[in-house]
């Protein structure tokens, strides 16, 4: 299929809807790192008595690394391709969840937060960036749907995570 984007005819990849769907799934998978964080704060404090302020620093580290390192992650996408960057981002997120489960000090929690932020930023930035690239003719639709995956992931999993923590 061909579309005219800003006056230029461009060939649209036939697999772009599949790729968009994969991007949404990836966003669903990383959502609870950010939107589900508050579910973990009180249980962590009750177990370790680190204080809410100290524990919340982990979230600040996560948000900082998730957002401010995206330009560097974008460089990696340009150099090595989106599949590798998303895969490595997913691996970092998985490692961070494991470290979180084993964290016995704030410094370990902070390391996990940094790794989670780097991984989530790699996934988020790459998926949104590629949605824009694959859907130059429907940028708002593609980026909105991809970003909605982030919110949908939280909406679908917050209650089960809360129940799991309470069990």
Name every feature range the model reports, one short phrase each.
Residues 30-33, 115-127, 150:
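Core transmembrane helices of Major Facilitator Superfamily
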Residues 49, 81, 102-107, 136:
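Helix-breaking motifs and short loop linkers at transmembrane-helix boundaries and internal kinks
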Residues 68-82:
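Helix-to-loop junctions at the C-terminal end of transmembrane segments
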Residues 91-104:
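C-terminal ends and interior cores of transmembrane alpha-helices
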Residues 95-96, 107-115:
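Paired small-residue
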Residues 150-167:
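Helix-loop-helix hairpin linking two adjacent transmembrane segments in secondary transporters
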